[in-house]
């Protein structure tokens, strides 16, 4: 009972149609979860293991689909974060705000272009078992007849703990991401990077009225071992963590995601 993803360069589309009319009747809860997924897509691709740290293939055509953070994906990721910071709250407050819905569609595509090359890492890896093993949780706004955690919600609930964990790998990049999300980093030190970025993510989670931890889905400390087991099989994503992440690290990350606020 673990969600997973399938990725291959042959699955990439050649055309995308971004029409805000298609999202006009989207419930605000769905817009919130999807928008926070955009946030984490961009944040994870920007903080992923740098592409130069990946094993070099025999020839360029054999590179993995997810290559790690790189200068081109960075451009898309940072702009996506800026778009989310400005327009996601507007979409949540007013579904008739066509400019905001259109800009969020663009922001989603920016983030997708970035992580489609760089990849995502720990928040998504941790989200898969949380979404796959949930029992008895029915999210507002989804008209669901079965237990489910919306994808973006299952991702973002782990992002603050991961930010605090990964910040020592590249404090300046984490501060850049926080600034793109609207944080004031003028007096910030490298040691502050993880906390500043985590708190900025939590700020948007609260604005979007998101659950404050995986306890809200019904999970407890006793469930952490099986959630860790479900994460360890996500090798494609774990390889992109900027820091070595095994069972011990995941255990602590899940523990820190039980209750954020």
Report the location of each language-model feature.
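Short alpha-helical scaffolding segments that buttress acidic/His motifs in well-ordered protein cores
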Residues: 39-43, 101-112, 126, 159, ...
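C-terminal charged capping/lid subdomain of soluble metabolic enzymes
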Residues: 174-261
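A glycine/threonine-rich phosphate-anchoring loop and its flanking beta-alpha core
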Residues: 1-65, 169, 175-176
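Active-site segments that bind and position negatively charged phosphate/pyrophosphate groups
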Residues: 51-195, 199
